[in-house]
């Protein structure tokens, strides 16, 4: 069985990136929660 984590910068950005988060209402909720928590990094 192959390892499940096959890193790809493009996929990472498209799925978990800042612009991907901003594109949906729920994504914006994620960012606001992370801001409220005081995260140094909001998204990938």
Curated annotation (Swiss-Prot):
One of its GO terms (biological process) is translation. The keyword RNA-binding does not apply. The keyword Chaperone does not apply. This is Large ribosomal subunit protein bL34. It holds the Pfam family Ribosomal_L34. NCBIfam families: rpmH_bact. The gene is rpmH. Belongs to the bacterial ribosomal protein bL34 family. Keywords: Ribonucleoprotein, Ribosomal protein. GO terms for cellular component: ribonucleoprotein complex; ribosome. GO terms for molecular function: structural constituent of ribosome.
